[in-house]
Amino acid sequence: MQVNSTISVKTFDVGPMLNMIYLIWDKKTKEAALVDPAWDLIPVLDFIKNNNINLTKILLTHSHHDHVNSVDKLLHLHDIPVYINKIEANFWGKKYDNLIELDSEENIYLGKSKLTSVHTPGHTPGSCCYSFDNNLIAGDTLFVFGCGRCDLHGGNPEEMYKSLKNLKNNFHRDTIIMPGHNYSIHRQSTLEEEINGNPFFNFNNLKEFVKYRMHDHDKTREEPYAPKIGRAHVRTPVTA
């Protein structure tokens, strides 16, 4: 559990794709949001009940099945709004009466504790992160020493390049990165560690980044991801 001045966070490891979902709550009011409800919710619901937490919101980083496949189940239990970037809402096409479409840099409140949505397209058109205090829930935009795929429907490596640049330029180096999947040797990192060890931060040329993301990366790296110092430090493929 990560704790800061006004907000507490509990991480749950769920599903066959190593998802990490996050329960965030205001320490004073116990108002909570669940980020990317998917797979097995029983441990989450038990934790909420046992700690007298009041779940009031669902926050989505994007609309891929492995991040939303328990939204309907949760809404049967809790009549609460679902927050998603407005571009992603259109891309997804799912209709909820209580769907709230977010602009980038729009604030969300749990009690008096503030979270901010950050539009980070690339993995999907409306992918977003959620920042609060010194933390960034990064969904499938940024993994520890990796980034989200851009070869699925709606993916765009040019947009991913811009999104990573925006994170690098607009967040403090000690920001804690909380990814949507546990694909690395570490569960979390700081932005400073990502800038120094994530190969996707080492590009200043868009064309080279696109080539690496779309063609070279999956041939030269394997999970769990470890830090790489410079683009040259990648595994050479073995040929028969």
Each language-model region and where it sits:
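Active-site neighborhood of phospho(di)ester-bond hydrolases with catalytic His/Asp-centered motifs
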Residues: L34-V35, T56-H64, V82-K86, H119-G122, ...
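A short acidic, helix-capping loop that chelates divalent metal ions and anchors anionic groups
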Residues: N90-K94, F145-L152
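Accessory terminal helices/loops
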Residues: M1-N4, K162-R235, A240
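Conserved beta-strand hairpin/beta-sheet module of binuclear metal-dependent hydrolase folds
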Residues: M1-I53, C129-G139
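Core dinuclear metal-dependent hydrolase active-site scaffold
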Residues: Y22-L23, E105-F132
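Short active-site segment of divalent metal-dependent hydrolases/proteases
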Residues: H65, N69, G126, F143-V144, ...
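A short alpha/beta connector and helix-capping loop motif
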Residues: F47-I48, I53, R149-E158
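Active-site HxH/HxHxD metal-binding segment of metal-dependent hydrolases
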Residues: L18, A32, W39-T116, G197-F200
